[in-house]
Every structure is written in C-alpha cells, then in structure tokens.
C-alpha cells in the first residue's frame, strides 16, 4: 500500500485522532499518577514501571534498565517485518522540591498517545515498520539521554520526536544551546592558620583563584557563549587552612562544536590554580547537553498537520523562522543527543501557565485539563509525521538528506 495515499485520506487522520480519543481517560490517569508521585533524576522507579508495564500489557516488547540507566526502558511494536523505525521519547523525572514543574508527565503521555495511535494504524493497514517508545529518565541536570546515547540508544532509528509543554505559546521546533557541567575538587593540606600556616596548602585559595580566572575568561567569549559557576565548599573554620574546596561550573555555547572549541581554554584554569597553591585537583565532567538540531522537514510537516487537520489556527503556531526568534533562549535539553544520531524535532505546546517551566505556576498548569488536551494534540501531530516517515519514501528521503547535510556541517557525519 502506498503510504502517501493513506495519509491523504481523512479517514486515516480520523483513525489517529480516534485512537487517542478512545484512550484519553486512561492517558489522563497515567499523567496524574506520574504528576502526583514525583521522582527526581534516576530515581523514577514507579514512573518507569507504570509506563513500561502499560505498554507491555498492550502487547509491546519491553526491555527495562537499558542503555546504562536503571530507570530507562525501551518498548517496541511492529506488525509487518522490515520498514523504518520511528521513536517517541517519554520523560518522567521531576524537579527536587518542585515536583513536575517542567511538565514531564505531559511529555510521557503525549508520546504514549503517539505510539498507541500509530500502533492502531500499523495493525489495521499492515504497515511495515517499528514503533519505539524510549523511556528517558534524568533529563533535569542528569543528561540521561546523553548517557543512553553513549551506550547505543537511537542508533539505526530513522526519526525520533517528542514534545514539551511551554508557558503560553506553541512552536513546531525548539532551539537550545549546548552545555557541559564540570565539578572541580581541590585537595590541600590542613594547618592551624595562626600557629603554623606555612604547613598548609589552601584549597580555598585554589577555588577562589579558579573562580577569578573563569570570570576573567568571560571577556574573551564569543557571542552566544557563557560560563556560570559557584563555590560549593571552601572551608569550615577561619582558623584552619582549608584542605578541601569544591566548585560547580558549566559552559554554554550555541552548538556542541563551539563548546568543544571553548573547553580547551576553560579546563586548564583548574590545574593552574592547583599548581599555584600547591594543591591537587580532580576535574569531573558530568552531563553533556548537546544543542538540538531540529529537522525542518519534520517540523514543517508537524505544523502543516496541526493547522490543516488538527484545529490549530496559523497564528497559534509560528512558522519555523518565527519559532527560531520566539524560542531563541539559553536553555538546554538532552534531546540534543538524539538529534545528532537521527533526524528529530522537539515541538512545544502551550499549557497556559502563569509562569515559565521550573516554577510553581507551571507545575499547577501541568496537571490541568487544558494541558492534557494540548499534549494529546501534539501527540496526534507527531504520530502523523512519523507515519509519513514509515510510509512515504520521498518524505523520508528528504528528511534524511537534510539530516546528513546538517551533520556534515557540524563535522559529525560518519558514513
């Protein structure tokens, strides 16, 4: 069956929408169960079990504890062998002290909605291909997708998509910066600061020197790059030479390529501070957040479906160029790691919150009925574009060619 003929039928779009509508109450239950039981990074045991069990009970093949993370899962579904593979990412971690103030409960059920509606189409029309739901924990400061990517996740997939709630606007794509965090520990030698200071090696001096040098580096940064940092510990008593100090820093850049250029100027600062103070230093680079490389082919199709078939007015969903202006901000998402492996988009949907993500106002809106309905509508659009990937060769080739060109420009293409 020619895939484009399927999608030109209003009947198939109706089937996608209907499959989600038939399960909207169950999806609402799952969303609220995640929302009411917030679990922070890499401790999402209940949410992981809830979602993976639900898919398994529908007949999906589920693996848990995958790609290096105990609370990650991968669920697969296919009817006819062969074909392409599309993936929907589900997030479910919460924020410490704030709960689901980033709306990850909505991300999870939006991806489930996409998956089960596409499942219905594959069954009814015997469409070749594989649907994957990837359970991705630890997005908030843990870089969960980066960890999973380094362990082989998303390799061989043809497309990967997800959605994210936003305060009061929607976009067919998002722009994020690349970011890398580093924890720095200086080890000195304790001594009494009054009676024998010459015997000490001051770790506090080391972290202060490092912090000052980082501040001096800022004037040399290119536009769009930034450095943030804080001193976490630098001694306990004024009359004791501190033998331990610790700081946390992060560097941000428009792309991971620019981040790689900045890192060699940033990292030597810590060894220099240690050498100058007679201390030793331990430098631990933690989660890498790569910039999101949005696939325009997918994003344009997402917007078209939203406006032409899913009831959104053109003024409610900016064009791609308008979106790049609207969502040009310094935030980060670990979805960037996925977007360097296969074509993808992370669309945004309005939840009519009183404040931006990571706020009480956003948390309150994330459990609301309006947010739930918008998450499901975004799930409908993602299902439709992924059905295009599975069934429309010309569309899939265009998407792939764009991805290859983007990776070549980023110096990341390895045929």
Q: How would you describe each model-predicted region?
A:
Residues 6-11, 29-33, 92-96, 185-194, ...:
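A short small-residue
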Residues 87-89, 183-187, 346-351:
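Non-cysteine beta-strand/loop elements that form the S-adenosyl-L-methionine
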Residues 205-415:
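Metal-dependent amide/peptide-bond hydrolase catalytic core
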Residues 2-131:
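Acidic/His- and Gly-rich active-site-bordering loop/insert found
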Residues 63-66, 138-139, 172-176, 325-329:
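Short Gly/Pro-enriched turn/cap motifs at secondary-structure boundaries
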Residues 71-76, 93-101, 105-106, 114, ...:
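Histidine/acidic-residue-rich, glycine-tolerant segments that coordinate divalent metal ions
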Residues 84-87, 130-132, 158-161, 344-347:
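Structural motif
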